[in-house]
């Protein structure tokens, strides 16, 4: 594990960019960027286009301001290159950004008010590959739809079970038990989640990271942020607009952003490089300001 990267993730001001759209969410991301579905004929072409968009973002001067401390990548992006260098190496060596890899394979159908991650027996193999690409950590998402005690316990147990396997490969996991912002008893679900997370953290011997939905009650996750086994807590934008997500985030001290959609809002394939860079820089500045409050 890279000690300098560990220090950066523990205490550097800034936020984590999420560029980990997978097959399912890529058409939506491309459409928002101004590329219609009829512009590509195959999955291969679709992934090439999204890689071009990500390359444009990562190579933009806006990405070199030191305000983004980490970036979450999709598998294909990790295996790809930017300006002739493997993506993770380019991020760290040219941008001083810590690379993470999305490792889940999507969600199971809802049961007990939650969606667990699909089983993934190849997790260890993917972790080894990530280590070979000089990736620092991972991220995996499951979703809480209802304030169901059993379901939430299952979610947290699965996240920590995967997390321990990931740690055994020398990678730092970002656990992401997202609470759906439309959950009818969101505050209650968060109470159960916090209790289960603290119970698991108390049993850990190596620190992990956590990605959460911005809580209903400001500063609700304070004990988790201060827990010795918690490296850093980041927040997802979860369907809120960038303005709304930034506003909510700025009220939660010690939590930094890990936004994807809110980061690319307003970017377009039609923009000149100057327009694109200015828009991206403004987005990064907004998210950064909300993260350091």
UniProtKB/Swiss-Prot annotation:
It is an enzyme of class 4 (lyase). Pathway: Carbohydrate degradation; glycolysis; D-glyceraldehyde 3-phosphate and glycerone phosphate from D-glucose: step 4/4. Keywords: Glycolysis, Lyase, Schiff base. InterPro entries: Aldolase_TIM, FBA_I, FBA_I_Gram+-type. The keyword Lyase applies. The active site is at residues 176, 211. One of its GO terms (biological process) is glycolytic process. Belongs to the class I fructose-bisphosphate aldolase family. Its EC number is 4.1.2.13. HAMAP family: FBP_aldolase_1. It comes from Porphyromonas gingivalis (strain ATCC 33277 / DSM 20709 / CIP 103683 / JCM 12257 / NCTC 11834 / 2561). The keyword Iron does not apply. This is Fructose-bisphosphate aldolase class 1. It catalyses: beta-D-fructose 1,6-bisphosphate = D-glyceraldehyde 3-phosphate + dihydroxyacetone phosphate. GO terms for molecular function: fructose-bisphosphate aldolase activity.
